[in-house]
Amino acid sequence: MKRDSGQKLPHVTTRRLLDMKEQGEKIAMLTAYDYTTARILDRSGVDVILVGDSVSNVFSGHNTTLPITIEEMIYHAKAVVRGVQAETSRSMVVIDMPFMSYQLSSEEALRNAGKIMKDNECDAVKMEGGKVVVDTVKRITDVGIPVMGHLGLIPQSIYKFGSYKVRAREQKEAEELLRDAVLLEQAGAFALVLEKIPADLAAEVTRTVGIPTIGIGAGSFCDGQVLVINDMLGLNTEFHPRFVRRYADLDGVIFDAVTGYVDDVRNGQFPAEDESY
C-alpha cells in the first residue's frame, strides 16, 4: 500500500490504541532503531514503533538483549523519534527499558523511565515481567509515564528459563500469566505484548483485559501484532522461527547491489561520464 508522506494523520496515543481495541481495528507495530527506518515506518502507516532492546542482537551483534545499556537505548530512541517527526509524526514511539534499568528498585526504575522520557520525545516505555514488576509499573504510571507490559517469553530472563521455547503451555503457568495480565492492567499498563504463548491463551488474555494485546508468536486473536523489522525484511537469514513472515529478502537484495557495485568499481565502470563533474 502506497501512502502519501504529506498526509498528516493524528498522532497515535494510548487513548487511540484503546479505541482501536474497542472498535476491533488491528494494531500494527514494528521495531526500528534508526532515523531512516523510522521515517519509512511512519510513512507506511505503522501505528506503534518499538525501539526494542532487540537492537542488542540485530544492530550490535550480541547473543542476547542483556548487554544493551540505557544510554545506547536513548541514542537509538532519539534517532527514531527524529525520523517520525520528519514524516507524518503519526506513529507512537515506545522504548524498551533495558535489563537492570528497572529491576533493582521502583525508585531507580522511575528515575530511568523519567530519563528516557526526558532525553527524547518518545511516548512510552516498555517493561518485561508480571507480578514482580507490578508495583514498579504502578509507581511509574502514577507519575504520568505510560508503560507497555510484556508477558510470555521475556528475553531479559533468558538465562533463568534457559531457552526461547513457547511459554505457558501448562495450565498452572497459563493461569499465572492471565493473573499477571490483569495485575498489569490494574497497575496502569496501557497495553501488553504477548510473546510466544499458545494462541488460545492469548485469545483468553485479550478477552479478559480491557487494554490492547499485541502478539508476537501468540496467534491471530491479539488486538495487534509486532515483529522485529530485520526479521520480517529478511535481513536475518539465520533466524526464521515459525511466527515470522518474511515480506522481503533484503539480505539478497543488498548482497546483489553491493556485489554489483564492487564489480563496477573494479572493472572501471563506475563512475560513468554522466556521474562525474
Swiss-Prot record:
GO terms for molecular function: 3-methyl-2-oxobutanoate hydroxymethyltransferase activity; magnesium ion binding. 3-methyl-2-oxobutanoate binds at residues 53-54, 96, 126. It catalyses: 3-methyl-2-oxobutanoate + (6R)-5,10-methylene-5,6,7,8-tetrahydrofolate + H2O = 2-dehydropantoate + (6S)-5,6,7,8-tetrahydrofolate. The active site is at residue 195. The keyword Metal-binding applies. Its cofactor is Mg(2+). One of its GO terms (cellular component) is cytoplasm. It comes from the Bacteria. Transmembrane segments: none annotated. PANTHER family: 3-METHYL-2-OXOBUTANOATE HYDROXYMETHYLTRANSFERASE. This is 3-methyl-2-oxobutanoate hydroxymethyltransferase. The gene is panB.
